[in-house]
């Protein structure tokens, strides 16, 4: 909605905004996806059908898994009709999906699925501030400059399909169960989780000792730990005794400054 406001498309319609010569619409994630094996006639899990190698791959409106199998996502189908109507009414297109591989793929698959041939240019921004949007609109690039990015995303998606669909069906044939699935990302991730679970299950805690010093200053109390640890109590006590009880430390410099600290990364599996 930030882009619509900046370009003056202030009138809100069902699935898009309009005004000032612009029509601004949006995608709800991947509205278009690669068709499932059933679409190509692979309705049964059979060894003689492997490997499944669609040529060409087909695009379909986003599907949802239900008790009845895969069905078309109604929300995705509705928004695709809105986008198709907007495409038909415009002279050219400004692509404002995320500035990255997946953002490029989202638009290109919609563009191809709808059979659109209108010329398009790329708005490449990483910030949605008014200034960034205006600057990006002044520096629009021809869509063809991002053909290689699209090719990379398209190839990745099709490779994932080939690996995931074929390997999952092969596993189903071998195991006799269709409840298992294999994927380029999900399978290694699951393996990492299982490995960590096994490590945690077999972990045996052991005691350790660590030296620390406590500093008291008025109402402030600070405790600092030495990074080294001892797995033997006698060694820790020997290290403690090696310190002079009368030793002291002097603060020679205090520096205060404001800094920006990035949020911590996600937990490491």
Task: Spell out what each predicted region is.
Residues 22-23, 31-72, 180-269:
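Long, highly charged, low-complexity internal segments
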Residues 36-39, 128, 133, 142, ...:
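Short capping/connector residues at structural and topological boundaries
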Residues 77-81, 131, 153, 157, ...:
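Generic alpha-helical secondary structure signal
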Residues 117-122, 157, 176-179, 254, ...:
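A generic, residue-level signal for flexible/boundary positions that often mark functional hotspots
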């Amino acid at each position: 909605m930030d882009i619509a406001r900046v370009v003056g498309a202030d009138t809100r319609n069902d699935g898009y905004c309009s005004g000032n010569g612009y029509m601004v619409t949006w995608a709800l994630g991947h509205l278009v996806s690669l068709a499932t094996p059933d679409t190509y006639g692979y309705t049964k899990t059979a060894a003689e059908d492997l490997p499944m190698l669609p040529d060409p791959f087909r695009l379909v409106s986003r599907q949802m898994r239900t008790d009845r199998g895969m069905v078309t996502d109604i929300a995705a189908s509705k928004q695709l009709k809105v986008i198709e109507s907007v495409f038909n009414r415009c002279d050219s297109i400004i692509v404002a999906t995320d500035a990255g591989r997946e953002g490029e793929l989202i638009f290109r698959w919609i563009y191809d699925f709808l059979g659109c041939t209108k010329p398009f240019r790329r708005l490449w921004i990483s910030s949605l501030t008014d200034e960034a949007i205006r600057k990006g609109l002044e520096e629009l690039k021809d869509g063809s400059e991002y053909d290689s990015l699209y090719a990379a995303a398209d190839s990745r998606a099709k490779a994932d399909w080939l690996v995931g669909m074929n390997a999952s069906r092969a596993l189903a044939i071998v195991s006799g169960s269709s409840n298992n699935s294999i994927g380029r990302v999900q399978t290694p991730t699951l393996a990492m989780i299982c490995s960590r679970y096994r490590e945690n299950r077999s972990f045996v805690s052991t005691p350790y000792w660590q030296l620390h010093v406590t500093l008291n200053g008025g109402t402030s109390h600070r405790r600092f730990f030495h990074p080294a640890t001892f797995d033997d109590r006698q060694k820790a006590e020997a290290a403690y005794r090696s310190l002079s009880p009368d030793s002291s430390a002097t603060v020679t410099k205090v520096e205060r400054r404001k800094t920006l600290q990035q949020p911590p990364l996600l937990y490491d599996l």
